């Protein structure tokens, strides 16, 4: 699952 946000990138 990958989620990209304007302030932070989170990869789990």
Swiss-Prot record:
Q: Which GO terms describe its molecular function?
A: aspartic-type endopeptidase activity
- Give the UniProt keywords, A-Z: Aspartyl protease, Hydrolase, Protease, Secreted
- Biological process annotations from GO: proteolysis
Q: Tissue expression, per UniProt? A: Expressed in placenta, specifically the fetal cotyledonary tissue (FCT) (at protein level).
Name of this protein: Pregnancy-associated glycoprotein 62A
UniProt source species:
Dama dama
Give its localization: Secreted, Extracellular space
Give the record's family classification.
Belongs to the peptidase A1 family.
> Taxonomically, which superkingdom?
Eukaryota
| Listed GO CC annotations | extracellular region
């Amino acid at each position: 699952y990958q989620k990209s946000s304007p302030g932070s990138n989170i990869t789990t």
